[in-house]
Amino acid sequence: VSNAAPATVLVYSSRPDVRAAVRTAVGRRPAADVGPLTWVECATGEDVVDTVDGGGVDLCILDGESQPTGGLALARQLTVEVADRPALCVLIARQPDRWLAHWSRADATLPLPVDPLTAPAVVADLLRDRVGRRPVAR
């Protein structure tokens, strides 16, 4: 019997291939004590805000390269506007952009392209941190 906590992970990118790459790299169970994951895909910034406002999302993985609304701006917006926001991870294509991730107040970064060796560990760590403070159902 597993004591793993199920979690809902929102993945945002304007590009379907990036959303698929994140889901594939992380999988349904990123660690023995984390998951299974339910994936929610969003293709627009408006969808992300609406979904997070609906409650029940544990983690958002946001593509910093998305157009027209980038994941870094969305992370900043969610931090400012949502008191009990989910954990936030932004995907960045260039390491020099890590300062932008810091500005956005994201909890973690992952490089693009997504590395299937590191992505599950980053996601699992973020979700473990959430266990004691589950999102408020609205």
Locations of regions flagged by a protein language model:
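Conserved acidic segment of CheY-like receiver
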Residues: 6-27, 60
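Short hydrophobic/Thr-rich beta-strand motif most characteristic of the beta2 strand and flanking loop
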Residues: 34-43
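Acidic, metal-coordinating helix/loop segments flanking the phosphotransfer/catalytic sites
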Residues: 42-59
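Conserved phosphotransfer microenvironments
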Residues: 58-79
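Conserved phosphoryl-transfer motifs of two-component systems
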Residues: 59, 107-111, 116
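C-terminal output helix
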Residues: 21, 114-123
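Alpha4 helix (beta4-alpha4-beta5 surface) of REC/receiver domains from two-component response regulators
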Residues: 93-109
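His-Asp phosphorelay/catalytic-motif detector in bacterial-type signaling
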Residues: 82-87
